[in-house]
């Protein structure tokens, strides 16, 4: 059994459903303390965060990850207890196996291997670990980044351990992410009887043309790194539940995933212009989850690509597809950011799992990145 597998199982046994850490960060800190990592345990409200650093000089290579996991769903539908890791058919099963306790284990073991051969490496190695990535993400990485900035500490390269691979380990790495902007629209009308529509004002009827116009907009054509901006309505609610009552208010929830071709300010302005043009009586609240970011090909992308080629014998694909990650909080500091981790096919699902053979391979890839950035 490998050290990476052992540590991954130890982490999975801890029931760290967001925002709980369940002792994972303490385990990581204790494991790395003998190697010279200085630990800062940072608690913001109900969220545990950990900043570990070895070295005081730049450049700084930081691994960013999260110990929290999503809820299991119906436990009876799992083939085994989601918090009792099981090995079956060459796979490690358990909540967090792919997202992303195996990545954390792989980087810890990579640090041990790297420092055994290169105790006098240049720069610094760091880990930024939070228990608030799967939840609101307001007291996790973003707060640690603010804390680092206040201390004058700067990350040069951020290696985010999110499960980026699709068919084979390392076949895809994320070198950017789209921005995410959500809106909650409330359109006011006047409630009334469906038989007397002239005595009421149906907000559904009023809003539908505007919503159709928003859904039909071609916001942009994307670019070589990003797909076109997407507008999606996720929820619509109106009425009392009775079939003979015209509703007095309509609530619509929507989201835009936008590329570097757009700004959140520009999107907001255009949405308001459409709603105003249709004469709606409305209020609209916004929530920006993150701006789009892109790490162009440079030291980090090159180091990751070369390490994958060395260990896996394949050329990786750069991608910005998918949802957001905590990389969105680190990129604005000027750091180069890539996401590299195991296969993502089972994340958040019943019977989440990861290939056992990929665990040590991922650790060797991480070791290769450390060597290329802090030795060569």
UniProtKB/Swiss-Prot annotation:
PANTHER family, per database record: ACETYLORNITHINE DEACETYLASE, N-ACETYL-L-CITRULLINE DEACETYLASE
Please state the Enzyme Commission number of this protein: 3.5.1.18
**Cofactors that this protein relies on:** Zn(2+); Co(2+)
Q: What biological processes does GO assign it? A: diaminopimelate biosynthetic process; L-arginine biosynthetic process; lysine biosynthetic process via diaminopimelate
Binding residue positions for Zn(2+) 2 = 99, 134, 348
- Subunit and partners: Homodimer.
Write out the catalysed reaction.
N-succinyl-(2S,6S)-2,6-diaminopimelate + H2O = (2S,6S)-2,6-diaminopimelate + succinate
Protein name (Swiss-Prot/TrEMBL): Succinyl-diaminopimelate desuccinylase
User: Which lineage ranks, top first, belong to the organism behind this chain?
Assistant: Bacteria, Pseudomonadati, Pseudomonadota, Gammaproteobacteria, Chromatiales
Family, according to the entry, reads as follows: Belongs to the peptidase M20A family. DapE subfamily.
- Physiological role: Catalyzes the hydrolysis of N-succinyl-L,L-diaminopimelic acid (SDAP), forming succinate and LL-2,6-diaminopimelate (DAP), an intermediate involved in the bacterial biosynthesis of lysine and meso-diaminopimelic acid, an essential component of bacterial cell walls.
Give yes or no: UniProt keyword Metal-binding: yes
**Which top EC class is given?**
hydrolase
Q: What is the protein's species of origin?
A: Thioalkalivibrio sulfidiphilus (strain HL-EbGR7)
* Pathway in which the depicted protein is active: Amino-acid biosynthesis; L-lysine biosynthesis via DAP pathway; LL-2,6-diaminopimelate from (S)-tetrahydrodipicolinate (succinylase route): step 3/3
Any GO molecular function: zinc ion binding
Disulfide pairs? none
């Amino acid at each position: 059994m490998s050290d990476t597998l052992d540590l991954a199982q130890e982490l999975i046994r801890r029931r760290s459903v967001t925002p709980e850490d369940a002792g994972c960060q303490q385990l990581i800190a204790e494991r790395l303390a003998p190697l010279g990592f200085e630990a800062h345990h940072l608690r913001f409200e109900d969220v545990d965060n950990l900043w570990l650093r070895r070295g005081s000089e730049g450049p700084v290579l930081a691994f960013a990850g999260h110990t929290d996991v999503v809820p299991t769903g119906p436990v009876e539908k799992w083939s085994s207890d989601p918090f009792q890791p099981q090995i079956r058919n060459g796979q490690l099963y358990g909540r967090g196996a792919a997202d992303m306790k195996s990545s954390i284990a792989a980087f810890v073991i990579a640090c041990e291997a790297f420092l055994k051969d290169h105790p006098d490496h240049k720069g610094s190695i760091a880990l930024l670990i939070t228990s608030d990535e799967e939840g609101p993400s307001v007291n996790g990485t973003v707060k640690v980044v603010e804390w680092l900035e206040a201390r004058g500490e700067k990350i040069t390269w951020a290696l985010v351990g999110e499960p980026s691979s699709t068919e084979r380990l390392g076949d895809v790495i994320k070198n950017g992410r789209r921005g995410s902007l959500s809106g909650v629209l409330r359109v006011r009308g006047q409630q009334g009887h469906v038989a007397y529509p002239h005595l009421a004002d149906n907000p559904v009827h009023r809003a539908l043309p505007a919503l159709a116009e928003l859904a039909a907009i071609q916001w942009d054509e994307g670019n070589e790194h990003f797909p076109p901006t997407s507008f999606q309505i996720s929820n619509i609610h109106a009425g009392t539940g009775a079939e003979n009552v015209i509703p007095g208010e309509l609530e619509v929830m929507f989201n835009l995933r936008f590329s570097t071709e757009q700004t959140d300010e520009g999107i907001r302005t255009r949405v308001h212009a459409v709603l105003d043009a249709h004469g709606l009586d409305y209020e609209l609240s916004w929530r920006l989850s993150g701006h789009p970011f892109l790490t162009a090909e440079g030291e980090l992308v090159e180091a990751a690509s070369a390490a994958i080629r060395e260990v896996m014998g394949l050329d990786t694909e750069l991608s910005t597809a998918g949802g957001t990650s905590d990389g969105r909080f680190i990129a604005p500091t000027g750091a180069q950011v890539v996401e590299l981790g195991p296969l993502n096919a089972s994340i958040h699902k019943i019977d989440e799992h990861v290939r056992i053979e990929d665990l040590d391979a991922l650790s060797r890839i991480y070791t290769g990145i450390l060597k290329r950035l802090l030795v060569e």
